[in-house]
Swiss-Prot record:
<feature type="short sequence motif" description="'KMSKS' region">
    <location>
        <begin position="523"/>
        <end position="527"/>
    </location>
</feature>
<dbReference type="GO" id="GO:0005829">
    <property type="term" value="C:cytosol"/>
</dbReference>
<dbReference type="GO" id="GO:0006438">
    <property type="term" value="P:valyl-tRNA aminoacylation"/>
</dbReference>
<keyword id="KW-0648">Protein biosynthesis</keyword>
<feature type="coiled-coil region">
    <location>
        <begin position="797"/>
        <end position="865"/>
    </location>
</feature>
<comment type="function">
    <text>Catalyzes the attachment of valine to tRNA(Val). As ValRS can inadvertently accommodate and process structurally similar amino acids such as threonine, to avoid such errors, it has a 'posttransfer' editing activity that hydrolyzes mischarged Thr-tRNA(Val) in a tRNA-dependent manner.</text>
</comment>
<dbReference type="InterPro" id="IPR010978">
    <property type="entry name" value="tRNA-bd_arm"/>
</dbReference>
<keyword id="KW-0547">Nucleotide-binding</keyword>
<dbReference type="InterPro" id="IPR037118">
    <property type="entry name" value="Val-tRNA_synth_C_sf"/>
</dbReference>
<dbReference type="InterPro" id="IPR002300">
    <property type="entry name" value="aa-tRNA-synth_Ia"/>
</dbReference>
<comment type="similarity">
    <text>Belongs to the class-I aminoacyl-tRNA synthetase family. ValS type 1 subfamily.</text>
</comment>
<feature type="short sequence motif" description="'HIGH' region">
    <location>
        <begin position="43"/>
        <end position="53"/>
    </location>
</feature>
<dbReference type="GO" id="GO:0004832">
    <property type="term" value="F:valine-tRNA ligase activity"/>
</dbReference>
<protein>
    <recommendedName>
        <fullName>Valine--tRNA ligase</fullName>
        <ecNumber>6.1.1.9</ecNumber>
    </recommendedName>
</protein>
<keyword id="KW-0030">Aminoacyl-tRNA synthetase</keyword>
<dbReference type="GO" id="GO:0005524">
    <property type="term" value="F:ATP binding"/>
</dbReference>
<dbReference type="InterPro" id="IPR001412">
    <property type="entry name" value="aa-tRNA-synth_I_CS"/>
</dbReference>
Amino acid sequence: MAELSTRYNPAEIETKWYRYWEEKGYFTPKGVGEKFSIVIPPPNITGRIHMGHALNITLQDIVVRYKRMKGYDVLWVPGEDHAGIATQNAVEKFLLQTQGKTREEIGREKFLEITWEWANKYRREIREQIKALGASVDWTRERFTLDEGLSRAVRKVFVELYRKGLIYRGKYIVNWCPRCKTVLSDEEVEHKEHKSKLYYVKYPVKDSDEYIVVATTRPETMLGDTAVAVHPEDERYKNFVGKTLILPLVGREIPVVADKYVDPKFGTGAVKVTPAHDPNDYLIAQRHNLPMIEIFDDNARINENGGKYKGLDRYEAREKIVKDLEEQGFLVKIEDYTHSVGHCYRCDTVIEPKLSDQWFVSTKPLAKRAIEAVENGEIRFFPERWTKVYLNWMYEIRDWCISRQLWWGHRIPVWYCQDCGHLNVSEEDVEKCEKCGSTNLKQDEDVLDTWFSSALWPFSTLGWPEETEDLKRYYPTDLLVTGFDIIFFWVARMIMMGYEFMNDKPFSHVYIHQLVRDKYGRKMSKSLGNGIDPLEVIDEYGADPMRFTLAILAAQGRDIKLDPRYFDAYKKFANKIWNATRFVLMNLEDYKEVPLENLKTVDKWILTRLNKTVEEVTNALENYDFNIAARTIYNFFWDDFCDWYIEASKPRLKTEERNLVQTVLVKVLDASLRLLHPFMPFLTEELWQKLPVAGESITIAKWPEIERELIDETAEKEFTRLMNMVRGVRNVRAEMNLPQSQRVKVYIKGYEVTEEEELLLKTLGNIEEVSFVNEKPPKTATAYVEEEIEAYVDLGGLIDFEKEKERLKQIMEKIQKEIDRLEKKLANKDFVEKAPEEVVEETKEKLNTNRERLARLESILRDLE
């Protein structure tokens, strides 16, 4: 039979098999049969993939390989995202480091040339990284959000939405990043708690000794104030409404207006209104027809409207203005104040609300069908709780600002006529104005938000706007696997665009995967230095152990706490699979498959367990319960197959039953490797190819089917009893400090074991002799009790009974103290309510384990009395 080296070496087999699969074209669909399609969430071209990508790709590949083995015509489309703001930032840093120049110094054309070189380099690297993970994507269909086909799709969508009145240009308050010098959508702003100050400032009433005290966290913005607002029902200020105030330091006259937006409980109940630099103030200004004065430039420095403060950074201006307010008697007091402040999701700079001309998508008309699809179950979220998160956001959806002040990205397809002012919006480049015929045109300088092109990903990657065969066959896709952090950025927008342009959902199921945290539960970040590089893990442990680790930890609705020790544990599992296969292969010299007749209880038991495992793993994968599927096959292979069946088979391989045992070993190993294949593709291919039943590739082998005729509940019950007897004997040895190699005599009461069972007991339990008794003999310890059946281990001549009794009492005392401690902990309401769920569960498990051990020792002690 085929030989297998003594050591499992992942590096040796991984490159070999991936190349083989690609050459054979296994990842390219054939276009016949029931289809299953999925698009990869495209990684950004800003560097190496991280552990979140590794989890995302692993989970997708598990489903894809499973579906392929189930006979589906599978298409998994790979690709990368141009990642506008992130890539531009990275290239700008690279330029400064390597050439000491800014993008403005080299100009748009040269900057884009360098960025394309960057993009191509990182796309190649990402491709190799995805291959290293074992992802069975169809590389012949790889796409990029800036490639020609997708660019055509982006332009078509922009133009069509514009013509329907769903894209418009307007002056609105936007989130401005002074570092990236671009607008950000609401979803690109990360809110963090800031310890700040609340400044109380007097605003004098014109021609009066009266004044209103206003509380603000941003005194620097008062340079742009155009009113003070109070609540219409606030009795304190009823006589002030309609009066004119003099703006401190500036001298501008501003009105007092009544508006229901104002919270009378905040500060003094009177708020300054700065319409050009606060979204809520902007709405107040619209309701009261107030002017809007911009005071910041694009760098968040005070502009010419700020008088003597012109040129100061916003924080410098705050310091100077507070000092001047104090000196001139306007500052009443300063209080400590904690509040939420928006930051740029890319560079962490505090964003500046800014009045700006931008392009927007009117989302409410698009959201209607996207809401209905999830409400009526046409699109399902896994775990189900994300449905509510999605719907709550969609019900309150705001218009989407899609223009970005960047160079890298899809340039907005709008040309402004410099002669007549007409906006030419077109899918093709415009040479002359459609209104006046002038050739004096200027294209909009801005690019589209990265998420605009990503929103078209499920259909643009399949060839839209062309009516391709791929589009007809593989749209809508079946599954999207993604993180919760981009439900609004990406998932919701894909659903809206899918219904608008394809008149159909983009996918049926959305699986929201876990966040990968470090072993302490902290988010992985550069600042903490706690990230784990998946490629380094692959180098050290192999892709398969890493994939299996991520899968077995991927419980729905619970973040992953990733301890690097897990990789070592599942590398040991890979070694176990390797060694078990090696054992089977070494015992197949004269292999001859025989009918499954004259099976012994142990054979019926393993075949029953196998078929139940097939059913459990299949059901788990159908419901995206990756951890349950992985844990089930792990337990079956390690415990049932290796620890019990292989051990039980060793003496039988030397008897006339050899061919039958070989047949069962091969059958179980073959099915196990196929069940494991979606999780550990490289290892399973290497091992499966050595089996006498192997075909061309495990990648295209059939998924194991449940053979119900091989399920024997009686045999399972009988062998389970036998296993529990053996475990009981092992436990007695362990508690009595006897080596597991110590052969012992066992007495059984209330049950006559068969010849086969006696042989198994002796083999598996290292038992010298099995005798049958009517009552418990002296100097024995109870190993097993089930209804009328009991088993005892003969300890005569093996231990000093008095010493053992003392030792056991001491151990029991320690265990009781631990039980008391754990019970006290669990009785503490604060601990149960405030500690993480997994910590509480772990404490309960420890308590149960200690109680069980104490009961076991009490039983043994009674036996020794």
